[in-house]
Amino acid sequence: MQVKLKVLLIGSGGRESAIAFYLRKSVLLSELKVFPGNGGFPDQELLPPDSFQVLDKNSVQSFLKQNPFDLIVVGPEDPLVAGFADWAAELNIPVFGPDSFCAQVEGSKDFAKSLMTEAKIPTAEYKTFSEYSDSLKYLESKSIPIVIKADGLAAGKGVTVATSKEMAQTALKEIFKDKKFGSSGNQVVIEEFMEGQEASIFAISDGDSYFLLPAAQDHKRAFDGDQGPNTGGMGAYCPAPVISESILQKVKEQIFDPMFDLFRKKGHPYRGLLYAGLMISPNGEPKVVEFNCRFGDPETQCVLAMLDGDLLELLYRASTGKIKGIQAAVKKGAAVVVVLAAQGYPDFYEKNIPLNLPETSGQNVHLFHAGTLKKDGKVFSSGGRILGIVAQGADLKSSVDQAYSFLEKIQAPKTFYRKDIGYRAL
């Protein structure tokens, strides 16, 4: 490709820091702007904080009319569910990210489940409720463990795997009565518990063709040994050996093919990234735990470390309907990301922690900012997940060793990280 592209990246997390890192390497990039960004981005890339309201159509379109871009890459789910890609499409600006109809695959768990039922995609049995009393009655007839999910967006924290009836009842009360997730909890999906190993697979689609990125395995629980509450993700590694070639073939034929076909049939070809969170049963059968309409966080940080090619070209081709015949080249070896989080995360956590960050020692270790901000030239924490440390090496063990040896050099009080990322594959 001979084009030069001015790119706008939307988001502020570790995922966006990683995407930006690889976009900057592209020969196609003429200029990168980021909104709202975090404490790790160079000042010259950041748009002013009052540039536009990311969930407001008039504000977004007014800004884009005055500040044209050749491509917009949307990191988080909220703007996509709100309709960001639709608003940009009205101005003929390519967006890497699906329209609001397709984005409901993440915006509503009930919508996602109904699509899976229609397309005969393997997933857990479920029932959706909008009344607290009905959900409690249904619960009485079910065995434990059971999974309780707020229907709408909840930053990865709206799911409870209940190991007792009391725990399930508490989860339902928190969603319906205490409004823990606001309007995202107006409906609740109750589904059967699935046994097996989880894995994440990303598909990049231009609405007609798609290709898969290497599989990753996330670590959602806060503490070592998969203990503690669910989080947005405490670390990941790639590739995930649980996804064999034969399982990958099933994932294509039983999950991605029918899902993309159904979106086309409904008049909404899926453009962007579709993330399948999978459960692989002990006998090697994949089932869908959830779909997301964007790059996963933190999996993106290690998946992109394994890509051997021009990320910007891939995203631009997907956004303009030109990926037929393209495959993502993948490096040999393995990559890992370990998240440094604030004490108390994912509940009430410390903020404004001063961060003393060492230089990344070699080309195989990268430090990606997530919940950080800059004040007077110094970096402080601003979110629950503060940093992601990524290492890529000849094998998973060497990558894990590199990541943890770098983490030990970071001076940040009142923080923690899991010390067993990648344990299932080591």
Swiss-Prot record:
Amino acids binding Mg(2+): E290, N292
Known EC number(s)? 6.3.4.13
**What SMART domains does the record tag this protein with?**
GARS_A, GARS_C
A Pfam family the protein falls into = GARS_C
Looking up PANTHER family in the UniProt record yields: PHOSPHORIBOSYLAMINE--GLYCINE LIGASE (PTHR43472), PHOSPHORIBOSYLAMINE--GLYCINE LIGASE, CHLOROPLASTIC (PTHR43472:SF1)
PROSITE patterns, A to Z: ATP_GRASP, GARS
Q: What is the lineage of its organism?
A: Bacteria, Pseudomonadati, Spirochaetota, Spirochaetia, Leptospirales
Full protein name: Phosphoribosylamine--glycine ligase
Specify the domain of life of the species encoding this protein. Answer: Bacteria
Which parts of the sequence belong to the ATP-grasp domain? 113-320
InterPro entries attached to this UniProt entry: ATP-grasp, ATP_grasp_subdomain_1, PreATP-grasp_dom_sf, PRibGlycinamid_synth_ATP-grasp, PRibGlycinamide_synth, PRibGlycinamide_synth_C-dom, PRibGlycinamide_synth_C_sf, PRibGlycinamide_synth_CS
Q: In which pathway does it act?
A: Purine metabolism; IMP biosynthesis via de novo pathway; N(1)-(5-phospho-D-ribosyl)glycinamide from 5-phospho-alpha-D-ribose 1-diphosphate: step 2/2
Task: List keywords of the entry alphabetically.
Answer: ATP-binding, Ligase, Magnesium, Manganese, Metal-binding, Nucleotide-binding, Purine biosynthesis
A single Gene Ontology MF term assigned here is: metal ion binding
Family per similarity comment: Belongs to the GARS family.
For activity, the cofactor(s) needed are: Mg(2+); Mn(2+)
* The keyword Magnesium belongs to this UniProt entry's keyword annotation: yes
